[in-house]
């Protein structure tokens, strides 16, 4: 924890009753909360959205907000304010979300509907160029020949922020487990900026605010490079970050050495959380002050994991980056 932003006392209210879901601190950290929709809420939600296939949500973007309202109404309109409060709270900003009864790949469409409803209670998910939709589904297998670490199973996918190589602001990231077979390892890795021991050192460095070039590989379907600094500040002057080691392109020796040292200290941070995410559950994090990655898998010839992601912006009038927008 650093001197810039200490954790404030804003833990889950003990004894707080919610309608349609429960909320508890996770076993890994009080910053990460576990939200579970009851079986009744899950069943009623799926019944009320059954008339709209996933394709309808893809074609008619307003339906994504409609299913969000249905879910919030089933939770006595307590869900939306709770989601926003948690994700915007610097001391927390992360949720592990589960719906009782949704836990099998045969329910993949239901998973997409649920995740879409939750995401569109806090904002709107951006267009994902990799998939051509507002969400992306992708598979990790035992052998991979892709052009990034996203699908490579036998190595750690280093901690990073999403949205570094696009111009849209990426306030939140949602990562859902759709299927898993013959899997050992591969936990999600999370690091809150304020738990990174070397934040002050790198945030105060002269290179922290220098715009750098970010370029994505062909699989991302993004051909335009973007330029922005690794660090910025929020409206209260606290550090936020837009960083990924694979796609930042240092222009010279000074930038390359600084980025390499930054990467080393992030990857060795003792503040990193290892979070198992079972099938049907998803992580929802504030992308400005949480970094995420993935631990390595144990090799198996029939290893398979399918994931779904959404990333987008909070539905607020103000930007959450203070300077470089």
UniProtKB/Swiss-Prot annotation:
Pfam families: CsiD. InterPro entries: GlaH, TauD-like_sf. It is an enzyme of class 1 (oxidoreductase). Its EC number is 1.14.11.64. It catalyses: glutarate + 2-oxoglutarate + O2 = (S)-2-hydroxyglutarate + succinate + CO2. Keywords: Dioxygenase, Iron, Metal-binding, Oxidoreductase. Its cofactor is Fe(2+). It comes from the Bacteria. Acts as an alpha-ketoglutarate-dependent dioxygenase catalyzing hydroxylation of glutarate (GA) to L-2-hydroxyglutarate (L2HG). Functions in a L-lysine degradation pathway that proceeds via cadaverine, glutarate and L-2-hydroxyglutarate. Homotetramer. This is Glutarate 2-hydroxylase. The gene is glaH.
């Amino acid at each position: 924890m650093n001197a810039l932003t200490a954790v404030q006392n804003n833990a889950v209210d003990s004894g707080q009753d919610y309608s349609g879901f429960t909320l508890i601190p996770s076993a890994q950290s009080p910053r990460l909360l576990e939200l579970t929709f009851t079986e009744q809420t899950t069943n009623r939600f799926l019944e009320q959205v059954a008339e709209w296939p996933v394709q309808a949500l893809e074609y008619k973007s307003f339906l994504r907000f409609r299913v969000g309202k249905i879910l919030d109404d089933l939770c006595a309109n307590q869900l939306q304010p709770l989601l926003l409060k948690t994700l915007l709270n610097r001391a927390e900003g992360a949720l592990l979300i589960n719906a009782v009864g949704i836990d099998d790949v045969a329910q993949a469409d239901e998973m997409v509907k649920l995740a879409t409803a939750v995401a569109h209670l806090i904002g709107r998910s951006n267009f994902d160029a990799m998939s051509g939709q507002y969400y992306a589904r992708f598979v990790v297998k035992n052998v991979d020949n892709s052009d990034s670490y996203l699908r490579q199973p036998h190595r750690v996918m280093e901690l990073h922020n999403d949205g570094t190589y696009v111009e849209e602001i990426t306030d939140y990231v949602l990562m859902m487990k759709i299927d898993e077979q013959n899997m050992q390892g591969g936990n999600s890795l999370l690091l809150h900026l304020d738990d990174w021991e070397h934040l002050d050192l790198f945030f105060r460095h002269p290179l922290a605010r220098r715009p750098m070039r970010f370029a994505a590989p062909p699989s991302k379907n993004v051909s335009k490079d973007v330029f922005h600094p690794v660090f910025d500040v929020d409206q209260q002057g606290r550090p936020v970050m837009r960083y990924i080691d694979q796609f930042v392109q240092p222009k010279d020796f000074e930038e390359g050495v600084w980025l390499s040292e930054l990467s080393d200290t992030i990857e060795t941070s003792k503040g990193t959380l290892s979070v198992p995410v079972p099938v049907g559950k998803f992580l929802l994090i504030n992308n400005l002050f949480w970094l995420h990655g993935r631990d390595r898998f144990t090799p198996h010839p029939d290893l398979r994991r399918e994931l779904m992601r959404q990333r987008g912006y909070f539905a607020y009038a103000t930007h959450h980056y203070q300077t470089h927008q």
